[in-house]
Amino acid sequence: MKIIKASEMGIGPAENRTKPMVAFVIACIIVLGNVQMTSAQTARLLPTASGTGACTDIMAYGGSPANRDNGTALAVALKASSGDGRCVYFPPGRFTFASNFKFMLPNGSASITLTGAGADVTQLYWPAGGGLTIDYVGAQNSVHLRNLSLTTGSVGVGTAVLLNQTNGDVGVADNALNELSGVTIRGADGYSQNDYWDRAVEIKQICNVNLVGLVISGPGGAAYSDKGIGVVLEGSTSNPAVVFNVTGATFDYLSKGIVYGQQVQGLTVSQSNFVGDDYGIYVPANISGLDQLTVVGSQFNCATAGIYVGSSLSNTLFSANLFIVPNTGRGIHLQQAYLYSAVGNSFNIGTAQGKTYPIAIEVGSTAGGGTITGNLFDSMVTAILLDRTSSGANVQSNEYSNDLTTVNNLGTGNTVGGGTP
C-alpha cells in the first residue's frame, strides 16, 4: 500500500504553514478589536431612514426603559434623521411617556416609521393615557407603525394613535400609503383586564391605510363589553377618507370595533375577528358621503350586532363570514340598505334562543335593492327579517336548520324564493 506524504496531499512542511497561521491569528485580533464597541456607539452608527433604510435607535438619544418620560428622546431622534424619511427603533422593553407625544411632519413629502422588536416585546406606555398624535400637512405624508404595543395604565382615557390631516384641501388622489403592522393596543395590566384606551386608533381625513395584524383589547369581566372603541375613520367634504384595508386584525371586548364617520369610503375587512364586542362594525345614523364596505372571511360574536349600518352606505358586500349570534341581537343589521349582497355566510346561535333574538339578517329602509343567497342559518328565532320599509330584496337558495322563522317578509317589492331570470 502506498503511503501518501503530507506534501503530496497539498499540505506543505511545517515551516510553510506558519505564515498562514500567523495571518489568521492577526485577522482574528483585528476583528475582535473592532467588535469591542459600546451599544451607544453602535446605535449612533446606525444609518438613518434617509440613508440606507435602517433606523436610529432611540437609546442613542437618551431613550431608556428607566426613563419616566421618553418624549424628549423620541423628538430628538426624529429630528436627528435628515431628509424626508425618518425612522426610530425601540428595542425590547417598556418605554414610558408622561403625556401625549405630538409630532408634525415637517413638509409635504415627509414620512416617519416607529418600529419595535415585536408587539409586547416593545411597549410604549402611557400611565395616564396620552398616546401618539401625528399631524400631516399634505397628501404625500405617511406614517408606519410596526411591531410594538401601545399600552395605558388608565381606564377609558385618551387615544393611542391619532393620524390627523391638517391640510384642509388634500382630496383623495394619489395619497401615500400608511400602515399599522403587528401593533397591539391594550391596557398595561394585560389583555381584557381593567385598563383600556377610550379610542385605540383614530384616522382623520387620511387615505390609503393598511391595518395588518392589529390587535385591540378592551376591558374584560363580562361576556360582552360596552366600553372602548377600536378604530374610528373620519373624513370631510373637502378631504374624504378613502381606502382602508383591515387584514388579520382582532377586536376584542370593545363597545365598537370599527366605526364609520362622515365621508368614509372603501373599507375592506378580511380574516379578522370581532369577539366580545357590543358592535363589530358600526355605521351610525345621520351621516353622509358613505360608500363601499366589504367584509370577507371574518368572524363575529357581538352582543347587539356584528355589523350595523344606520346610514345610507352603498355597495356593501358580506361573504364567507361566520356570525355567532347571541339572544341579544343580530348578525347583520342593515337599517339603511343600499345595493347590498350577503353571500355564503354562516349564522349560528351563541346562546339559547330568546323571544325575539337571535336574528341573523335584518333589512330596513332600502334605497337600492340587495341579494341574500347561499347562506346557512342555524337555530335563529328569525333567519331573515325584511322590515316594513324594505324593498327590492332578493332572497334565494339559503339553507335553514332549526330556525323558528326562516323569512319574515314585511316589506314591499321583495322577492323570496322562486329563482331569478
Each model region followed by its residue ranges:
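N-terminal secretory signal peptides that target proteins for export/translocation
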Residues: 1-17
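Extracellular beta-strand-rich solenoid/capping regions of secreted or surface-exposed proteins
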Residues: 75, 79-81, 96-115, 123-176, ...
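Boundary at the C-terminal end of the N-terminal hydrophobic targeting segment
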Residues: 38-40
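Short glycine/acidic-rich loop motifs that flank beta-strands on beta-rich extracellular proteins
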Residues: 86, 98-100, 119, 123-131, ...
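Leucine-rich solenoid repeat scaffolds
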Residues: 373-421
